[in-house]
Amino acid sequence: MKFAVIGNPISHSLSPLMHHANFQSLNLENTYEAINVPVNQFQDIKKIISEKSIDGFNVTIPHKERIIPYLDDINEQAKSVGAVNTVLVKDGKWIGYNTDGIGYVNGLKQIYEGIEDAYILILGAGGASKGIANELYKIVRPTLTVANRTMSRFNNWSLNINKINLSHAESHLDEFDIIINTTPAGMNGNTDSVISLNRLASHTLVSDIVYNPYKTPILIEAEQRGNPIYNGLDMFVHQGAESFKIWTNLEPDIKAMKNIVIQKLKGEL
């Protein structure tokens, strides 16, 4: 079977490395390639995928919303989030999914016991935030809060959860057990601080969905304060694992997938 990831730029993607480690571990002769698709060529996406006989593909920046009109069907999670990161090509039809939210939550469950009782704050109100919130909503509905700088970003949110602005979140930071940053702060050299951690409780787990850099500014600051931290590596691995399940109905070797990514990030490959 043939798989791929589409985006622009895409040469930096670790998805091919991660998926090939999984294929090798499972003795599968599958392939996975990175396909650069500039925005001005996206109208040819059906032709590009068809000519390569792709059975399923991941979608990354900047095409997660752009892909939707080209789909024949879309699952409820992706529809709710308004973004697609996984496409199954089956019997000539394209079916869209979003595995980012479940990928993050599956990883979080493995390192945090008692998540059902945790008071959780999500920073940011973009697509990633909505995907994670949708999954956490199933587990911790009454204790889930999302904060954003501008409240208007919540206008298209249907989830009945606590929605506050960042200044309100800052003044009540000590009430939360887990804080999840989904904003671009700390990514690609961005050193802006998304929120002040002055009122952070000592037990609070501080998380970021970014995995490269391995530690974003908010994680570095939290670690310096003595707090446990959790980056986006597991989210990346688990969203890929969920994609693999959708494409093949097989269980992936998550350990092999994670180990190869860690080796690459450490410069060991």
Curated annotation (Swiss-Prot):
- Enzyme category, top tier: oxidoreductase
What CDD domains does the annotation carry? NAD_bind_Shikimate_DH
Record GO biological process: amino acid biosynthetic process; aromatic amino acid family biosynthetic process; chorismate biosynthetic process; shikimate metabolic process
**Record-listed NADP(+) binding positions:** 76, 124-128, 148-153, 209, 232
Q: Which reaction does it catalyse?
A: shikimate + NADP(+) = 3-dehydroshikimate + NADPH + H(+)
Short name of one Pfam family: Shikimate_DH
Q: Which GO terms describe its molecular function?
A: NADP binding; shikimate 3-dehydrogenase (NADP+) activity
Give GO cellular component annotations, separated by semicolons. cytosol
Residues reported in the UniProt entry to bind shikimate: 13-15, 60, 85, 100, 211, 239
- Which residue numbers mark the site Plays a major role in the catalytic process and a minor role in the substrate binding? 211
Q: Which UniProt keywords apply?
A: Amino-acid biosynthesis, Aromatic amino acid biosynthesis, NADP, Oxidoreductase
EC?
A: 1.1.1.25
**What Gene3D superfamilies has UniProt attached to this entry?**
Leucine Dehydrogenase, chain A, domain 1, NAD(P)-binding Rossmann-like Domain
The listed outcome for residue 211 to F is:
Leads to a 345-fold decrease in the catalytic efficiency and a 3-fold decrease in the affinity binding for shikimate
Please state the pathway this protein functions in, per its UniProt record: Metabolic intermediate biosynthesis; chorismate biosynthesis; chorismate from D-erythrose 4-phosphate and phosphoenolpyruvate: step 4/7
Active site location:
64 (proton acceptor)
**NCBIfam families from the entry?**
aroE
**In UniProt terms, what function does this protein have?**
Involved in the biosynthesis of the chorismate, which leads to the biosynthesis of aromatic amino acids. Catalyzes the reversible NADPH linked reduction of 3-dehydroshikimate (DHSA) to yield shikimate (SA). It can also use NAD to oxidize shikimate.
Family recorded in the similarity comment = Belongs to the shikimate dehydrogenase family.
Subunit arrangement?
Answer: Monomer or homodimer.
Record's protein name: Shikimate dehydrogenase (NADP(+))
**Which organism was this protein described from?**
Staphylococcus epidermidis (strain ATCC 35984 / DSM 28319 / BCRC 17069 / CCUG 31568 / BM 3577 / RP62A)
- Encoding gene, per UniProt annotation: aroE
